[in-house]
UniProtKB/Swiss-Prot annotation:
One of its GO terms (cellular component) is cytosolic large ribosomal subunit. Residues 198-243 are annotated as: Disordered. The lineage of its organism: Archaea, Methanobacteriati, Methanobacteriota, Stenosarchaea group, Halobacteria. The gene is rpl2. This is Large ribosomal subunit protein uL2. Pfam families: Ribosomal_L2 (PF00181), Ribosomal_L2_C (PF03947). Part of the 50S ribosomal subunit. Forms a bridge to the 30S subunit in the 70S ribosome. Signal peptide: none annotated.
Length: 243
């Protein structure tokens, strides 16, 4: 009798597979919609959050509110942060898309007005405000996709700090382990054909091969549901003279 495969263990939701969200420092969203046209604050610290790759700025606002916000490139301790309709066009300031000139890089862009920010939040990325229409602002996301958003959606001026992160190698397996552990990822990932027969349907044998068809039905039981699940087609497709 075989053991539970990795997918079945993950489905139980034990601490091995859950992200340690109790260590995360902030939910990271814009302030509530400002009642006045401008609120200012001072950056008192730059912090690291295990939940994300980008650094966070600890901002003390004049109205007594203190919160962590996404830190764009160029923002340092002691800088002034402005939030509101009449904020200046400077890195770190937050305002509606209607008040931002075309061609300015922005980050932490809202999808719907007041949702706190959904787009361009990873380290080193930014979106670009392309143009203003009558009832929409056209924004190019880091993926290249064009989105028509409400002019009332807010965004932060600048590029998210921490760029070049993906260019630096992990060097040691321990570094990769700690990175994956902080997000709840299971690592390393072992191939099924490299396992023993008791651990995976594709395991065992004198050589590494599945030993059975890889295509399985959508209704396959969990312990056998591995490989190409409900695949429409398999193989290399264009071989055999097909157009």
């Amino acid at each position: 009798m075989g053991r539970r495969i990795l997918g079945q263990r993950r489905g139980r939701g034990t601490s091995t597979f859950r992200a340690p969200s109790h260590r995360y420092k902030a939910d990271l969203s814009h302030r509530n919609v400002e009642e006045s046209d401008l609120v200012t604050g001072e950056v008192v610290d730059i912090e690291h959050d295990p939940a994300r790759s980008a650094p966070l700025a600890d901002v003390q606002f004049d109205d007594g509110d203190r919160r962590l916000v996404l830190a764009p490139e160029g923002v340092t301790v002691g800088d002034e942060i402005q939030i509101g309709v009449s904020a200046e066009i400077a890195p770190g300031n937050t305002m509606p898309l209607a008040e931002i000139p075309e061609g300015v890089p922005v980050c932490n862009v809202e999808r719907q007005p007041g949702d706190g920010g959904k787009f361009a939040r990873a380290s080193g990325v930014s979106a670009t405000l392309l143009t203003h229409d009558r009832n929409a602002a056209v924004v190019q996301l880091p993926s290249g996709e064009m989105r028509r958003l409400s002019p009332e959606c807010r965004a932060t001026i600048g590029v998210v700090a921490g760029g070049g992160r993906t260019e630096k190698p992990f060097v040691k397996a321990g570094n990769k382990h700690h990175k994956m552990k902080s997000r709840g990822g299971k690592w390393p990932r072992v191939r099924g054909v490299a396992m023993n027969a008791v651990d995976h349907p594709f395991g065992g044998g004198g050589r590494q091969h599945p030993g059975k068809p890889k295509s399985v039905s959508r209704d396959t039981p969990p312990g056998r549901k591995v490989g190409d699940i409900a695949s429409k087609r398999t193989g290399r497709g264009g071989k055999g003279g097909q157009e």
